[in-house]
Swiss-Prot record:
Annotated metabolic or biological route of this protein: Aromatic compound metabolism; phenylacetate degradation
Function as written in the Swiss-Prot or TrEMBL entry: Catalyzes the oxidation of 3-hydroxyadipyl-CoA to yield 3-oxoadipyl-CoA.
Protein encoded by which gene: paaH
Protein name as catalogued: 3-hydroxyadipyl-CoA dehydrogenase
Result of knocking out the encoding gene: Mutants accumulate 3-hydroxyadipate and are unable to use phenylacetate as a carbon source.
Keywords: NAD, Oxidoreductase
Factors inducing expression: Activated by cAMP receptor protein (CRP), integration host factor (IHF) and by phenylacetyl-coenzyme A (PA-CoA) that prevents PaaX from binding its target sequences. Inhibited by PaaX.
């Protein structure tokens, strides 16, 4: 089924369809850009023209190359014109029934050797291909927005997809300057599945009134190295879009609790507070937001303090124990240890987050803050919360990545590549897990599961296996 792809058809002239068309045309392909609306096609091509002209102005592209690229774009409103395509990339409605009907029509219009692909972010490739002729030529080709900029493409195989089709799509997207990753058709594929905890744990913290949205975002962004905080990111994506993907994955996994949608996010969607595009979401985008600056400097003088670093993430500051989070509350630790306890959530960067036991004397908590500020840290304080913000979120992402790996969704390398390039995580989750330590991640999730009594935090069996191997190597 290997064919020479010269003509590419793109179905849908919205943001994603236009972006994919621009990519294909920029790499020498004649592109048939299809939409039922001639006006939408005009807007799409005008937008591509404007983007290419901007690159010419900035010296990134020659005027001649710009002109040649635009000449390769052919707007079409008759689906029968797509019979000339070697590859079709559908980027239209994210509804299964619409896609099934469209692909059935494409299977009749296009020759048997034409590769039929969909840019869906989460819909089953197997379901789309199930009732059409030659289902072995159907695959997922999931670009990320904006398509001309983002490197990642998920190449998704359904149950019937031929191996040579996947191979050819990987080679083609590589020639377009993209980084393909291979995965099997499961809900959310790689990125939209493994990324769900980044959003869901932020919503849970907001629901439990652990901290203000800007503190939650600052902790993950400035304390763990994520490019954006989870709540501001949902505002940028669009609350309706992000919520719909979460609901899709949740229902596709038979209401698996790890993917439980948020009632707070649902309220925003119902209320039309969709984020940046509507002006209101988690944040008010009509007004300038103030930066999170951390706690005020503690003016008390606690010097000289006796500081002793114990094993396993414990620092003793006079009578106060500063303990790196392992999934227990500060209150539980303080009562068990009969000492003032401040739990710290830190991973990378200057920002650290703390939570203090309610039984602590105020001076004990202030002493811990003073110590951290003297180390040059920006300190954020949240309510006493097991697993805190950073470690809980990262542990859940790693657990989900391990579950996807164990179930054969994709290779370890492709999962890590997908999360680094698709959502710009500072590390691939599986490499991150090895760096942080499997035993600590397992212990944290077990403590969370015990605290909540929920299956949401159950560690996957591959995490248990890796933690066991790690303990064996260390003994």
């Amino acid at each position: 089924m290997m064919i020479n792809v010269q003509t590419v058809a793109v179905i849908g002239s919205g943001t994603m369809g236009a972006g994919i068309a621009e990519v294909a045309a920029s790499h020498g392909h004649q592109v048939l850009l299809y939409d039922i609306s001639a006006e939408a096609l005009t807007r799409a091509i005008d937008g591509i023209h404007a983007r290419l002209n901007s690159r010419v102005t900035r010296g990134k592209l020659t005027a001649e190359t710009c002109e040649r690229t635009l000449k390769r774009l052919i707007p079409v409103t008759d689906i029968h014109a797509l019979a000339a395509a070697d590859l079709v990339i559908e980027a239209a409605s994210e509804r299964l029934e619409v896609k099934k009907a469209l692909f059935a029509q494409l299977a009749e219009v296009c020759p048997p050797q034409t590769l039929l692909t969909t840019n869906t972010s989460s819909i089953s490739i197997t379901a789309i291909a199930a009732e059409i002729k030659n289902p072995e030529r159907v695959a997922g080709l999931h670009f990320f927005n904006p398509a001309p900029v983002m490197k990642l493409v998920e190449v998704v195989s359904g149950l019937a997809t031929a191996a040579e089709v996947v191979e050819q799509l990987c080679e083609l997207t590589l020639s377009w300057g993209k980084q393909p990753v291979r995965c099997h058709s499961t809900p959310g594929f790689i990125v939209n599945r493994v990324a769900r905890p980044y959003y869901s744990e932020a919503w849970r913290a907001l629901e439990e009134q652990v901290a203000a949205p800007e503190v939650i975002d600052a902790a993950l962004r400035d304390g763990a190295g994520f490019p954006m905080g989870p709540l501001e990111l949902t505002d940028l994506i669009g609350q309706d879009v992000n919520f719909a993907v979460t609901c899709s994955v949740f229902n596709a996994f038979w209401q698996e609790r790890r993917f439980l949608p948020s009632l707070v996010q649902q309220e925003l969607v119902i209320g039309g507070r969709l984020g940046k595009k509507s002006g209101l979401g988690v944040y008010d985008w009509r007004a300038e937001r103030e930066a999170v600056v951390g706690l005020e400097a503690v003016s008390d003088s606690f010097s000289p303090m006796k500081v002793e670093k114990k094993s396993d993430g414990v620092t003793e500051i006079d009578d106060v124990l500063l303990i790196e989070t392992q999934g227990e509350t500060a209150q539980a630790l303080a009562i068990r240890l009969a000492r003032p306890v401040v739990v710290i959530d830190k991973m990378a960067g200057k920002v650290v987050t703390i939570a203090a036991a309610a039984v602590n004397p105020d001076s004990a908590t202030r002493k811990a803050i003073y110590y951290l500020q003297q180390q040059g840290k920006t300190v954020l304080q949240i309510a006493d919360y097991p697993g805190m913000l950073i470690w809980r979120t990262v542990a859940m992402i790693i657990n989900e990545a391990l579950d996807a790996l164990q179930k054969g969704v994709a290779s370890e390398q492709d999962i890590d590549t997908a999360m680094r390039l698709g959502v710009n995580y500072p590390y691939g989750p599986l490499a991150w897990g090895a760096q942080l330590g499997w035993q600590r991640i397992l212990r944290l999730l077990e403590n969370l599961q015990h605290h909540y009594g929920e299956e949401r935090y159950r560690p996957c069996s591959l995490l248990r296996q890796r933690a066991l191997l790690e303990s064996g190597y260390e003994s």
